[in-house]
């Protein structure tokens, strides 16, 4: 039976990938990516979903872009491989969190997002890539990356789609707070 993509917030981790200073000027639709990434970061706090933030070779590429409103409660992991799964620290954290779903957003769609999505699948995780919170230097690379991930079994979602899937129902305090975020 095919996977349905039903996600449980208690078994989910958000991973913000490589939204770093040196990448910012070259990335297509960067303002939308930053806006939606900030919504996801804030939602991770509201929904009590762990947030892992990665930085690709920060010594050369800078740290997480200052317009990303990172919470105090996050796990920051530096990496040199395109995939977080190349980091023992990342793998250890995923195992500690006991998650079965991973939500990916950040840059670049056709490099690090793609590699992480495929490696997460290989590690038996359900993978959700937030299409309106990823980008590349060209729209074509983003589009091809999304198609490639979809072919492999990744669930392609939007910011609002994943948040309301995680909420499950209206009328809660979480629902009210998330609704304010996406308006």
PLM regions and their residue ranges:
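Conserved residues at the C-terminal ends of beta-strands
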Residues: 17, 55, 105
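Active-site-adjacent betaalpha module
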Residues: 2-13, 59-183
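Active-site loop/turn elements of alpha/beta-hydrolase fold enzymes
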Residues: 19, 56, 132
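Generic N-terminal amphipathic, Lys/Arg-enriched alpha-helix
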Residues: 10-26
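A positional/architectural concept
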Residues: 22-27, 31-53, 58-59, 63-69, ...
């Amino acid at each position: 039976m095919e996977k349905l993509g039903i996600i449980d917030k208690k078994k989910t981790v958000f991973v913000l990938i490589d939204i770093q200073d040196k990448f910012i000027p070259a990335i297509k639709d960067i303002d939308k990516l930053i806006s939606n990434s900030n919504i996801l970061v804030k939602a991770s706090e509201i929904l009590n979903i762990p947030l892992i933030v990665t930085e690709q070779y920060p010594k050369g590429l800078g740290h997480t872009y200052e317009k990303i409103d990172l919470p105090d409660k996050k796990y920051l992991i530096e990496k040199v491989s395109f995939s977080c799964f190349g980091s023992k620290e990342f793998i250890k954290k995923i195992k500690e969190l006991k998650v079965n779903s991973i939500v990916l957003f950040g840059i670049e769609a056709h490099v690090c997002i793609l590699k992480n999505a495929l490696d997460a699948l290989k590690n038996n995780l359900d993978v959700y890539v937030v299409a309106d919170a990823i980008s590349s230097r060209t729209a074509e690379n983003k589009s091809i990356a999304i198609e490639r991930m979809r072919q492999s079994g990744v669930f392609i979602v939007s910011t609002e789609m994943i948040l309301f899937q995680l909420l499950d129902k209206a009328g809660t305090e979480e629902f009210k707070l998330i609704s304010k975020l996406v308006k």
